[in-house]
Curated annotation (Swiss-Prot):
One of its GO terms (cellular component) is cytosolic large ribosomal subunit. Forms part of the ribosomal stalk which helps the ribosome interact with GTP-bound translation factors. Is thus essential for accurate translation. Homodimer. Part of the ribosomal stalk of the 50S ribosomal subunit. Forms a multimeric L10(L12)X complex, where L10 forms an elongated spine to which 2 to 4 L12 dimers bind in a sequential fashion. Binds GTP-bound translation factors. It holds the Pfam family Ribosomal_L12. Keywords: Ribonucleoprotein, Ribosomal protein. PANTHER family: 39S RIBOSOMAL PROTEIN L12, LARGE RIBOSOMAL SUBUNIT PROTEIN BL12M. This is Large ribosomal subunit protein bL12. InterPro entries: Ribosomal_bL12, Ribosomal_bL12_C, Ribosomal_bL12_C/ClpS-like, Ribosomal_bL12_oligo, Ribosomal_bL12_oligo_N_sf. GO terms for biological process: translation. It comes from the Bacteria. One of its GO terms (molecular function) is structural constituent of ribosome. It comes from Geobacillus thermodenitrificans (strain NG80-2).
Length: 123
């Protein structure tokens, strides 16, 4: 049996593609999902909390548009996914592309994708 340190070291040496496959295998084996939990917020207290600016944004690929190949290339560049994974993501829109990113990064990603004809939502 491997120690926690050995497991961490093995994960540190994996490629992005290998890590993606590992996550999928863990999801299937244990019946869980690696998606970030969604917090349901209650009503804002006297509107004070609603005025606070959101600091983390999710970038959602809503539609790939007519130039799917260009969109797949940009998705690969942004996410580091392999060709098959990027194609699957683009073919099955709407899908989250990046989660919990800064406003600047979200706007940059949105601009890159819209430049090649994709429809993108920032939430």
């Amino acid at each position: 049996m491997m120690t926690k340190e050995q497991i961490i070291e093995a994960v540190k040496n994996m490629t992005v593609l290998e890590l993606n496959e590992l996550v999928k295998a863990i999801e299937e084996e244990f019946g869980v999902t690696a998606a970030a939990p969604v917090v349901v917020a209650g009503g804002a207290a006297a509107g004070g909390e609603a005025a606070a600016e959101k600091t983390e944004f999710d970038v959602i690929l809503a539609d790939a548009g007519a130039q799917k190949i260009k969109v797949i290339k940009v998705v690969r560049e942004i996410t580091g996914l392999g060709l098959k994974e990027a194609k699957d993501l683009v073919d099955n829109t709407p899908k989250p592309l990046k989660e919990a990113v800064s406003k600047e990064e979200a706007e940059e990603i949105k601009a890159k994708l819209e430049e090649v004809g994709a429809k993108v939502e920032v939430k």
